[in-house]
Design a protein with these regions (language model features):
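Single conserved hydrophobic/aromatic residue that forms the stacking wall/gate
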Residues: 1-12
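Membrane-interfacial helix-loop connectors
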Residues: 24-26, 32-42, 52-61, 69-74, ...
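Transmembrane helical segments that form the transport core of multi-pass membrane transport proteins
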Residues: 5, 104-177
Length: 235
């Protein structure tokens, strides 16, 4: 029984660590993969899958803080309080959901098999790699031809993929685009991306998933807080 409980504990920790590490390179791909894996999850594991997704979102904010600091101290000084607050909120919501986990009885608990060689993970990574290239090109030409209006629109559209190329292209054009516009578009892209991540999580987890109420509640709180902070920024 002790070995079985220890095995379950390792499974739960593995999901959380996957979310934290995955958020350092792509929260969108990480959330999609976690949602796919969760289709075989028990009711007891549901909270940890969603907690791992929110930890990935939390790490995304920290990742962008580092990238922005590297490319533009001016933008960093105006945006870091918002990103830091949202990272803490996402982590806090994730930890709260993790703490709601129902511990299974030793007699009926079985650790989930870890299928780290799942080819679906490679397919998801490949799809997002292609989208990364597409949005890199789109962002470049939007900056050249479409102006501020095009940037605002693209900041929301870019959320359907990894928003890293969009934000990196913005940061590399600080000489031709106002700092306020870059900061606003970066925050809008992040909000859009979190909303899309929530829909990806719901879609890949499948209909009737045990994760659904936790996904809606957890991501809903994070998105609502993001919108409030964005309003404060515009005020």
């Amino acid at each position: 029984d002790r070995l079985r409980s220890r095995g379950l504990g390792d499974v739960y920790k593995r999901q959380l660590v996957s979310g934290i590490i995955g958020g350092l390179y792509s929260s969108t791909a990480t959330i999609s993969v976690l949602a796919r894996k969760s289709r075989k999850a028990s009711e007891q594991e549901a909270t940890d899958y969603v907690a791992a997704m929110l930890f990935a979102v939390s790490m995304m904010f920290l990742r962008f803080m580092i990238l922005i600091l590297i490319f533009s101290r001016e933008i960093f000084q105006s945006i870091y309080p918002y990103l830091l607050i949202m990272s803490v909120i996402a982590a806090a919501v994730g930890w709260f959901i993790h703490s709601r986990q129902k511990r299974p009885k030793d007699s009926d608990a079985e650790p989930e098999d870890d299928d780290s060689s799942n080819p679906l993970e490679f397919k998801v990574a490949l799809i997002f790699a292609v989208l990364f290239v597409i949005f890199t090109v789109l962002t470049h030409y939007t900056l050249v031809y479409a102006g501020t209006g095009g940037l605002n629109l693209l900041s929301f559209v870019s959320g359907f993929s990894d928003i890293t190329p969009f934000i990196l292209n913005l940061l590399q054009n600080t000489g031709s685009v106002a700092a306020l516009i870059i900061t606003a578009c970066s925050m809008q892209a992040i909000i859009s991306n979190i909303m899309v991540n929530m829909f990806y999580a719901l879609f890949f987890a499948g209909k009737g998933s045990k994760l659904r109420p936790w996904i809606l509640g957890g991501f809903g709180v994070v998105i609502a807080c993001n919108f409030v902070l964005l309003l404060f920024f515009y005020l």
